[in-house]
């Protein structure tokens, strides 16, 4: 099952040239870039592992792509995403986020429904490999 999180998630995987173009777009607007990775793509898992610190002072897309490549080498079977942060309002707000690496075999999600008091329905999601 293809995980659909962030911008461009319903499109085919971006090439490195397309990723570079998106990074240049972000840097051109003064947004900082951060690289994150995870092996658990559950929709409620919003806290991915950071790959280094966000690159607040970087103005060159090549530096971001070097970090992406290093993260890909260290975590080839994990999800890797780029986050762009906009601080123009005095807050570091995620303005853009998209996946740049996926494992060869993506896990699927299984939903379990249980009935409780008053016929209330409760749902549980599990990641299956």
Curated annotation (Swiss-Prot):
Misc. remarks from the entry: The basic functional RuBisCO is composed of a large chain homodimer in a 'head-to-tail' conformation. In form I RuBisCO this homodimer is arranged in a barrel-like tetramer with the small subunits forming a tetrameric 'cap' on each end of the 'barrel'.
Gene Ontology BP annotations: reductive pentose-phosphate cycle
Function: RuBisCO catalyzes two reactions: the carboxylation of D-ribulose 1,5-bisphosphate, the primary event in carbon dioxide fixation, as well as the oxidative fragmentation of the pentose substrate. Both reactions occur simultaneously and in competition at the same active site. Although the small subunit is not catalytic it is essential for maximal activity.
Species annotation: Sinorhizobium medicae (strain WSM419) (Ensifer medicae)
Top-level taxon in the UniProt lineage: Bacteria
Lineage: Bacteria, Pseudomonadati, Pseudomonadota, Alphaproteobacteria, Hyphomicrobiales
Residue segments, region Disordered: 104-129
Subunit structure: Heterohexadecamer of 8 large and 8 small subunits.
Keyword line: Calvin cycle, Carbon dioxide fixation, Plasmid
GO molecular function per UniProt: ribulose-bisphosphate carboxylase activity
Segments of skewed composition (Basic and acidic residues): 104-120
Assigned protein family: Belongs to the RuBisCO small chain family.
Protein name listed in UniProt: Ribulose bisphosphate carboxylase small subunit
InterPro entries: RuBisCO_ssu, RuBisCO_ssu_dom, RuBisCO_ssu_sf
Signal peptide: none
